[in-house]
């Protein structure tokens, strides 16, 4: 099984292409550029009253980058609900390498010390490319996504790429755009087209407020110690709900 070069992987993301495998056991990886792309506009996350209530309750302890490898392994695991997966060992190793380089991040949901949900993705410029999520308890993946959106908004990101639209993501505000519109949005998020407030008919969060380097850890108050930068710590669910705005 051939390793995926991490620099090649980042270049692929920069032009809207990402890798997949046919199965967990597949030796080969193929590159995907969908004609229709799922994105979640950061200013239009659909926070239902029930989800807001769950987040406010702090039922889950939510962290960032605390257990990246475990999250990817859970997303790659074969379950009764997911008899196969597109994450083969080469893809898993490539994202672990990007994580070590600071280009891939995870959000984890914990319950009584157990990892019960989470997601991971790739960060490049002002874009975050969501790769996969999992849930071992009801609403855990929704909570993880809500915390991710709040983190991206606080950090000045412009684009959350969901790759493919699903009913689950659509219920949370994800939409589908054409390939051309997606590339325009991606160019804005990566700073190729600076100063534009919208692309492809979709507003880009924060674009009109000036151009500053996005910071995945801005939500943590700018902590510099590695052990504190990666943990959400004292941030409450109430704060996250406030960051996400009005409930629907």
From Swiss-Prot:
Single GO term (MF): leucyl-tRNA--protein transferase activity
Pfam family, any one: Leu_Phe_trans
Record's keyword terms, sorted: Acyltransferase, Cytoplasm, Transferase
Recorded superkingdom: Bacteria
Cross-referenced InterPro entries: Acyl_CoA_acyltransferase, Leu/Phe-tRNA_Trfase, Leu/Phe-tRNA_Trfase_C
Gene3D superfamilies given in the database record: Leucyl/phenylalanyl-tRNA-protein transferase, C-terminal domain
E.C. no: 2.3.2.6
Record field: transmembrane: none
Protein localization: Cytoplasm
Catalysed transformations (reactions): N-terminal L-lysyl-[protein] + L-leucyl-tRNA(Leu) = N-terminal L-leucyl-L-lysyl-[protein] + tRNA(Leu) + H(+); N-terminal L-arginyl-[protein] + L-leucyl-tRNA(Leu) = N-terminal L-leucyl-L-arginyl-[protein] + tRNA(Leu) + H(+); L-phenylalanyl-tRNA(Phe) + an N-terminal L-alpha-aminoacyl-[protein] = an N-terminal L-phenylalanyl-L-alpha-aminoacyl-[protein] + tRNA(Phe)
Any one GO biological process: protein catabolic process
GO CC annotations on file: cytoplasm
Protein family (similarity comment): Belongs to the L/F-transferase family.
NCBIfam families: aat (TIGR00667)
Summary of the function given for this chain in its UniProt record: Functions in the N-end rule pathway of protein degradation where it conjugates Leu, Phe and, less efficiently, Met from aminoacyl-tRNAs to the N-termini of proteins containing an N-terminal arginine or lysine.
HAMAP family reported in the protein's UniProt record: Leu_Phe_trans
Protein name: Leucyl/phenylalanyl-tRNA--protein transferase
Gene for this chain: aat
């Amino acid at each position: 099984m051939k390793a995926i070069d991490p620099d090649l992987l980042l270049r692929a993301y920069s032009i809207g292409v990402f890798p997949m495998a046919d199965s967990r056991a597949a030796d080969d990886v193929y590159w995907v550029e969908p004609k229709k792309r799922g994105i979640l506009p950061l200013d239009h996350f659909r926070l239902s009253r029930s989800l807001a209530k769950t987040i406010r309750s702090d039922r889950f302890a939510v962290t960032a980058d605390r257990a990246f490898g475990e999250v990817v392994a859970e997303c790659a695991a074969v379950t009764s609900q997911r008899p196969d997966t597109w994450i083969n060992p080469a893809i898993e190793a490539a994202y672990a390498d990007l994580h070590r380089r600071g280009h891939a991040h995870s959000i984890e949901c914990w319950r009584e010390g157990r990892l019960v949900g989470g997601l991971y993705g790739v960060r490049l410029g002002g874009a975050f490319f969501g790769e996969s999520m999992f849930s071992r308890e009801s609403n855990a993946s929704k909570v993880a996504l809500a915390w991710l959106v709040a983190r991206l908004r606080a950090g000045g990101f412009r684009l959350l790429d969901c790759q493919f639209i699903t009913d689950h993501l659509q219920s949370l505000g994800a939409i589908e755009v054409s390939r051309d519109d997606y590339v325009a949005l991606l160019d804005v998020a990566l700073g190729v087209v600076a100063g534009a407030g919208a692309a492809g008919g979709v507003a880009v969060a924060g674009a009109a407020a000036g151009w500053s380097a996005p910071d995945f850890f801005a939500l943590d108050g700018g902590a510099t110690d590695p052990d504190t930068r990666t943990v959400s710590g004292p941030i409450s669910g109430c704060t996250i709900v406030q960051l996400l705005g009005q409930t629907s």
